[in-house]
């Protein structure tokens, strides 16, 4: 159990290290603390905090910096979210001000806005609704024996993929396939469509001699529509906080942000974090799955748009980020994104 004075010292070290980015010594603390304490007493208290693992010493300085344990304790017990002023809220609202035709456009834009506001890497996850339905199906001729297979979901999202037509299929057969899919599958939930599609294979074979290829393409588009879709803004902002002397870390981070499998997006999920702070989750350093991110923290929040599902927003930045400000900002941004999505769905559902 930390004493009141030790709590003040820990909080001041974290705040000053966030502002200055340099180890904090006893003289600096003596000037910053709201209570009068001798430099010797401060050094003794710092020794206690260091022994308990809340702060650590850098070899090149006599000052101290927060440890991951120190940050964790601070976020769980000491942080007070900054209230975002009305001018900043209006600024966020104006950045969201465009009209959108697809929900994915809103989610993609939110990642860019959040990244621009923080100068960190932002990750946004599209709402995932268990009762999403297949709203429409089309095949658009592209020429050279190819068509674009297009699925429209009930939330307005659109997925598509190119399909190479068999040599012997004609326009009449193609129209028959479109009618069959619309008659038998449109209106079903996306989770049901997968199994129903297999049941349709004997009928599809009447019009497409080798229907396996079509079913594979259709199934691939369904998978994209069902799985969690995320967007990343400011990928390269990660490099701003890398250790400039550690060439291997920089190379590995480059690999991480350019990874086609989007490992960054995989950091965000819809599970509850044991360190939730009034609906805001904070993961610090080794609490994330990737060892490359030991010097980073993830601040995330879930948003809920009722029957249209739940999604998530997050920022990935340095462990010495200003947590009070970032938690307050993420909280406000989550509310504004939710409002924007509710407005979108209200218009779409009419």
UniProtKB/Swiss-Prot annotation:
It comes from the Bacteria. PANTHER family: HEAT-INDUCIBLE TRANSCRIPTION REPRESSOR HRCA (PTHR34824:SF1). GO terms for biological process: negative regulation of DNA-templated transcription. This is Heat-inducible transcription repressor HrcA. Keywords: Repressor, Stress response, Transcription, Transcription regulation. The lineage of its organism: Bacteria, Bacillati, Bacillota, Bacilli, Lactobacillales. Signal peptide: none annotated. Belongs to the HrcA family. Negative regulator of class I heat shock genes (grpE-dnaK-dnaJ and groELS operons). Prevents heat-shock induction of these operons. InterPro entries: GAF-like_dom_sf (IPR029016), HrcA (IPR002571), HrcA_C (IPR021153), WH-like_DNA-bd_sf (IPR036388), WH_DNA-bd_sf (IPR036390), WHTH_transcript_rep_HrcA_IDD (IPR023120). One of its GO terms (molecular function) is DNA binding.
